[in-house]
């Protein structure tokens, strides 16, 4: 079994963040006609956002306007963004299993 040490994981995350900053202008350069809005964010209690950023870039490249709420977003902020931006798609991400309850809570608030 392979072993990974926390400093290596942290360094690889920093490298990925830097790579995303370099790649984003290239990926979204060919953006077509605006086809709607997407609201995305990482649920409250979770600070991981590399996957969310990649998904956001793909939506932008496909022609969507992306409203990224950031990390550790409370359900109320999702509701405020939905009311303000009237998105076609809402996406929320999480990596930690400890935030599973918050994922359900966010979904309940959005569906209400």
Describe each model-derived feature in a short phrase.
Residues 1-112:
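Domain-level signal for soluble alpha/beta catalytic cores
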């Amino acid at each position: 079994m392979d072993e990974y040490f926390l400093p290596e994981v942290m360094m690889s995350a920093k490298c990925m963040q830097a790579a995303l900053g370099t790649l984003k202008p290239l990926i979204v350069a060919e953006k077509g006609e605006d086809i709607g809005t997407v609201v995305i964010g990482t649920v409250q209690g979770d600070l991981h956002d590399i996957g969310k950023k990649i998904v956001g870039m793909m939506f932008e490249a496909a022609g969507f306007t992306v409203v990224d709420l950031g990390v550790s977003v409370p359900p109320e902020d999702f509701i405020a963004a939905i009311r303000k931006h009237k998105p076609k798609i809402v996406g929320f991400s999480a990596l930690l299993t400890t935030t599973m309850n918050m994922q359900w809570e966010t979904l309940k608030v959005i569906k209400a």
